[in-house]
Amino acid sequence: MLRRALEEKYALKIGEIRTTTAVICSISTDTILDFEKQCLKPHCTFSKPIINLGYTYYDIPSEYKEELNESIAVNHRIDAYALITTFDETPIESIEPLISNDKSEIKWTFLLDWTELHQGTWLRFLSKQFESLESKGYDLKNENISVWCMNSDYMFELQKNDILWESFHFEYLQQSLRSVLFYRNGSLIYVDKKRNQLPLFEIFVKLCLHNRNDKYKSLNQFTEMSETSQVFIPFNSDSEDLIKTIDEEFQPEEVLKPDFMPTFEKVIPYSKPKDEPHLPPIGELPHFDMNKELEEAAIILKQASKKEAYAKQNI
């Protein structure tokens, strides 16, 4: 009788595994490895990537099951997939056959990295990922997305060693990210590996599980907005007025306009990656067309000659 009652209550058979799918997307393998090291438990390591795909899982312990109002007899697991993306799209097709959840239930984690991808491209990168996934029927507006900015401690190095970066730029960047996520009902996290005091793994788990129970619809106990490099702003906790407290002249609704992104890209200074990329193997060197290069050089010289002749005529 007890077994039948539990099965009816939870719409599952005892021993059946209830899964939540989380997809962690990044343009860089190194950033995914940083996320694994900084934000996951030691035993939650991604399997050796097959091409651009990694996998790990986490079985929910009993204390979480009690909060979720689930029977301890019900097995609950987070299936986490690490996916290397291109700049323009998320190749979700590689894991679609493995996903058991409805498209509207998948939890999306997008990784940005202060030491990798140029910060001025962040909004365009996110926009392209969102568009790519939404065109395939995935829901990225229903508390299902979070953006994790890894290695945010690098901000201090930029501020100290790069004369182009000023406090305004860091504030403008954060306000822009917060605004994008505010209108999508998403969450923002800055991960400072040197100073971090946020319970990153717990945040990740609860972001994955929040829609199982109303208790998970409030992560405000972890909210952190005051620290420059340690930020956690969960969905439903931000507002236009809060975003404007950083700089009241910033208008959050501007991020919804087509001309905001070009403005953002002009405002944010270029900063080269912390580690210069290695030269590609000889077999992967880009094609060099000598004739094309000579033709382009000839055009440039011809234009320069014309300008010089014109200048002499007008002396």
UniProtKB/Swiss-Prot annotation:
Enumerate the UniProt keywords alphabetically: Cytoplasm, Cytoskeleton, Dynein, Microtubule, Motor protein
**Where is the protein found, in the record's own terms?**
Cytoplasm, Cytoskeleton
Q: Name one GO cellular component term.
A: dynein complex
Membrane-spanning parts: none
Tell me where on the tree of life, at the top rank, the source sits: Eukaryota
Quaternary structure? Answer: The cytoplasmic dynein is composed of at least two heavy chains and a number of intermediate and light chains.
Chain's role: Component of the cytoplasmic dynein which acts as a motor for the intracellular retrograde motility of vesicles and organelles along microtubules. May play an important role in the proper orientation of the mitotic spindle into the budding daughter cell yeast. Probably required for normal progression of the cell cycle.
Family, per entry: Belongs to the dynein light intermediate chain DYN3 family.
User: What name does UniProt use for this protein?
Assistant: Cytoplasmic dynein intermediate light chain DYN3
Source organism: Candida glabrata (strain ATCC 2001 / BCRC 20586 / JCM 3761 / NBRC 0622 / NRRL Y-65 / CBS 138) (Yeast)
Phylogenetic placement of the source organism: Eukaryota, Fungi, Dikarya, Ascomycota, Saccharomycotina
